[in-house]
Amino acid sequence: GQPIAQSKAAMRRALRSMQPGDTFQVIRFSENASALGPDPVPATPDNIRRALKYADSLEGSGGTQMIEGVRAALAFPHDPGRLRFVVFLTDGYIGNEDQILGAVHQHVGPARIFPFGLRSSPTRHLMDRMAILGRGVVGYLGLNDSATDVMDGFFERVSHPALTDVRIELLGVESPAGATVGVDVFPRVSRDLFVGRPVIITGRTDAG
């Protein structure tokens, strides 16, 4: 149907947006998870063609067990020479939110997570929290949205981050009486700053 067609269109656009020197992997998840191969592969023309064929062969089946996809996507060893972007595409209602968020929190490491929900069915709270924990950005595609246009915009943003590993720390804040006060900042570890996507930081002091 329309959701799987949108998913395939988004995957095709993402694969064709790979740059020389990139590596990638494609993971399918429903009741279980399966992958294009055991490890990320270089973005060579042959590997991209193989991945496009794999993506075209995918069909929707069963329920949406996102936990299997999360575990599979975050299980690859970290490459200190690369910044890993994990893009999740789903159109299903997703249960076991606490288990999924716990797995993301435990295994995300330095990876960035970008969840994309198709139609109105995905659980927005879960998608939003995954993006926060993964220091990424959440996106939603309606039935009339172009998956190609959405993925083009996504790659345009993430290909040119203005700042990465943004951390906020305030020291020596004084109250009107001159006393040093404590400060709470949220989030302490922010997502990366991308062009056209402002980062919002909030703070609260003991002084109110």
What are these regions (language model features)?
Residues 1-208:
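Exposed acidic/Ser/Thr-rich ligand/metal-binding surfaces
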